[in-house]
């Protein structure tokens, strides 16, 4: 149980803005800090999935700036690397002007880094005295694995350079997650879950009341007053705001704010609508967060497989837990939902992610409704196996290995002029 608690504490962290551009800003801020001055030349080398997820999303606190160059520029002039995923929380209007000036001067060059892990960012910054700093992030959004200045090593983390991103999560299983959620002392996780509920609800509120994205959440909320539609709307609304540059922080899951919101809001809606007590909501969130992490460890943090699918499926499992406390139904919910939603591709972070979240949450709820009515998909139907752990692994295998070429084609299609 201690390991599950530590896992949650390491994953459910606060982030301001979409995590891929924020990760670039973090690397850029670190490069400037080590260099000791504003660079006169910057080269940004990114894996394909980073480029894909930064291309169409608004960088927070920039008045609408988008793209790798924008994230690099604002991180360089205004970032504070000590703040991690809140690196851009102190941006001023003057900083935005300076970042735009940097973009106008065309000193930032972006290139695709091939043959690397899906989450790989390297920034090489040079000043007017030809001092050079190299900063590299790998595997997780805040993991700076290498810093050099004039080829002298300042920092290197060999462990994170070579360690698979989910190596320490091997003990995860749906059964053990269920036992943990049932029995853990809630005092160990109460503050963590309260932050998740409070922050993710706040950005969802903003998505429903402000002018963000295509207003997917608002539209769903206005169309239908059912609990199902409210769950979809509240999750989508948070993404409406986040993908369009809202600076409110969120609690993430598996490195993703959208996934953190998707894990949170459907359960908050069901708890409010059905008057569940706080303990029931907390334990349901433990199921959802850990199931999402469990599914994602086989898929990878970034891939061609849309990440909110796993979060929507996990939300269905959490709702099932709150309503039934039944392990068999939770396993069937996950299996059913994966058969409904698997296959949705990731074509980058952008406003339409809100609609994908609504689709994923709908699949999670459908999976649960099928399970509670004893109408389940059977083993042999597509990727569904006899055992839920085998099913999760089969989905992960298709997503991580089978969709590699899909990922390449999606990226090339997106960057075609």
Swiss-Prot record:
PANTHER family: UPF0597 PROTEIN YHAM (PTHR30501:SF2). It comes from the Bacteria. One of its GO terms (biological process) is L-cysteine catabolic process to pyruvate. One of its GO terms (molecular function) is L-cysteine desulfhydrase activity. This is UPF0597 protein FMG_0209. Belongs to the UPF0597 family.
